[in-house]
């Protein structure tokens, strides 16, 4: 992250104020203030993660993934013959915190701040799937979007989606 000295000074002052306003996280803000003031390039890359950006397309894809899981759960609930479908496989696990942190952050924002999908269970890991999920979800999404009745899926369609 490239910043002018003026930008670094402004951000440093912001962290100093946050130290006073949020004593519970004061140590974190002091650390960030030091990094900014001294211009530690390696550590300043952390700010790229904090101030990262998700494109509109990625946000819409994540919402579609969450909507697909909602449709899977609704469809499963409405099935009379659930065959050998395991309900746990329909659960939205989230994304990997280590490699997909921005996606995970958006999911948490959608659920906890925006109030969308309140029925999704965050589990003990707060939607941290602890394994990469982006590619799997996109394969599932392609199958789901090809289904003619996306909210009235048959057991076969559900199986095809979760096995994608």
UniProtKB/Swiss-Prot annotation:
InterPro entries: UPF0304_YfbU (IPR005587), YfbU_alpha-helical_sf (IPR023146), YfbU_helix-hairpin_sf (IPR023145). SUPFAM superfamilies: YfbU-like. It comes from the Bacteria. It holds the Pfam family YfbU. HAMAP family: UPF0304. Belongs to the UPF0304 family. This is UPF0304 protein PC1_2778. It comes from Pectobacterium carotovorum subsp. carotovorum (strain PC1).
């Amino acid at each position: 992250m490239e910043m002018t000295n003026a930008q670094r000074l402004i951000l440093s002052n912001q962290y100093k104020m946050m130290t006073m306003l949020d004593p519970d996280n004061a140590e974190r803000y002091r650390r960030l203030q030091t990094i900014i003031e001294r211009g530690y390039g390696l550590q300043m890359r952390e700010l790229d993660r904090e101030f990262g950006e998700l494109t509109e397309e990625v946000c819409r894809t994540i919402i579609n993934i969450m909507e697909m899981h909602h449709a899977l759960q609704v469809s499963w609930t409405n099935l009379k013959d659930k065959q050998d479908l395991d309900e746990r496989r329909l659960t939205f696990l989230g994304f990997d915190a280590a490699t997909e942190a921005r996606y995970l952050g958006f999911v948490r924002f959608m659920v906890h701040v925006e109030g969308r999908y309140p029925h999704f269970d965050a589990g003990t890991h707060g939607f941290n799937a602890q394994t990469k999920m982006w590619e799997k979800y996109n394969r599932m999404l392609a199958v789901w979007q090809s289904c003619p009745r996306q909210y009235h899926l048959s057991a076969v369609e559900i199986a095809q989606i979760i096995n994608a």
